[in-house]
């Protein structure tokens, strides 16, 4: 079912500068809590992510990373668990979706989220574009009757040439993102045909993104230098684009369509990413001893046979807290901090991925904070206490 996947140890190293970009850009308005950089470091969360990541696409990788650092409440975790169940029960569906998701494995796919969050490029000198285009058409039509109008046309062409190539960089910058948008649209359509979880909401978003994709075809179009006839044809097309500002006008419309439909692009992005993340967790369940968490009200925690996902051959531990706290003591190097990390990591995966690395896990849905890797700094005049409370 997952033949396209590599075992975790054989997968290429994660580039967290690219993977985390979506998490840092995405507004967390619907989140009850996000895992900050300090807690991420305390829990070795990036290393944990590398161990549990089974995603196929770069979009899925970004969404899985954002999910594991964003707590959106018990209902969201349980809904994600139901999506995971869907792929756990239906291996053929998971395999078919994995095939579709494999289109978005190129590193350029990390840049798809730029279309959602980046400030749109501004077309330079756009106020002059329509008047110059009308003048170019008028002088060309007048040429058979007033040949001298060709001189005016050449002057206008020179100005349009400057405008055209002044904006060429903006057009080229969108080239790879537009290619990934087309691939993502095709992927989303195929996932929708399979009626994976989230299809009903995504259908309208896919339709809106298709309108953006149609307007994006002007971006990144280049001539075929390997074919002389094609190169000649492309040259004449390029001259027409320059003379009548065709590329500049279409690019402006493309930017406008992206701005107007960012929510739809984001919705489609999440539809693809959440599907990939759910398949990833389904695969993780099939490979690793895990359980489904039970969320309860009140001050009660029971974790049986809980282990740390980064430690091979980890000795399981059991903890029950019923209305009480815990003071953990022991000698140096006895595993106190590792045990704390184990509990917090399992609480985190329970509240974000609806799985735990344990025999059973019962606890309330709660905020997660840590302060483990702190130190004093004489040069900056900070003590352990100040670092802890700041």
Which residues does each predicted region cover?
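Alpha-helical coupling/stalk and coiled-coil linker elements that connect catalytic or binding modules
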Residues: 3-331, 339-344, 350-368
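A general alpha-helical scaffold signature found inside nucleotide-binding enzyme cores
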Residues: 179, 387-390
């Amino acid at each position: 079912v997952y033949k396209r996947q590599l075992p975790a140890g054989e997968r290429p190293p994660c580039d967290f500068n690219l993977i985390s970009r979506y998490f840092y850009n995405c507004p967390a308005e619907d989140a009850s809590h996000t895992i900050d950089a300090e807690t991420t470091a305390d829990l070795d969360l990036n290393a944990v992510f590398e161990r549990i990541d089974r995603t196929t696409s770069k979009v899925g990788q970004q969404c899985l990373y954002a999910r594991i650092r964003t707590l959106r409440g018990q209902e969201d975790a349980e809904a994600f668990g139901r999506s995971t169940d869907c792929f756990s029960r239906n291996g053929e569906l998971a395999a078919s979706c994995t095939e579709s998701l494999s289109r978005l494995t190129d590193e350029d796919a990390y840049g798809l989220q730029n279309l959602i969050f980046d400030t749109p490029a501004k077309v330079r000198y756009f106020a002059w574009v329509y008047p110059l285009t009308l003048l170019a058409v008028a002088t060309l039509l007048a040429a058979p009757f007033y040949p001298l109008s060709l001189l005016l046309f050449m002057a206008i062409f020179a100005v349009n040439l400057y405008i055209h190539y002044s904006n060429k960089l903006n057009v080229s910058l969108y080239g790879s993102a537009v290619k990934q948008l087309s691939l993502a649209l095709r992927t989303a359509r195929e996932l929708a045909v399979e009626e994976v979880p989230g299809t009903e909401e995504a259908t309208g978003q896919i339709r809106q993104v298709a309108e953006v994709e149609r307007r994006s075809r002007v971006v990144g179009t280049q001539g075929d230098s390997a074919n002389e006839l094609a190169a000649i044809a492309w040259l004449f097309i390029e001259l027409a684009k320059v003379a009548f500002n065709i590329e500049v006008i279409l690019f402006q419309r493309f930017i406008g369509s992206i701005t107007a439909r960012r929510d739809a692009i984001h919705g489609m992005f999440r539809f693809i990413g959440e599907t990939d993340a759910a398949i990833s967790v389904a695969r993780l369940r099939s490979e690793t001893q895990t359980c489904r968490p039970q969320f309860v009200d009140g001050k009660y925690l029971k974790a049986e046979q809980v282990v740390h996902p980064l430690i091979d051959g980890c000795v399981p531990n059991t903890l029950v807290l019923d209305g009480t706290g815990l003071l953990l003591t022991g000698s140096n190097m006895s595993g106190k901090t590792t045990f704390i990390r184990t509990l917090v990591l399992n609480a985190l995966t329970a509240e974000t991925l609806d799985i735990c690395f344990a025999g059973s896990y019962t606890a309330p849905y709660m905020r997660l904070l840590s302060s483990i890797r702190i130190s004093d700094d004489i040069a900056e005049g900070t003590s352990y206490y100040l670092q802890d409370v700041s």
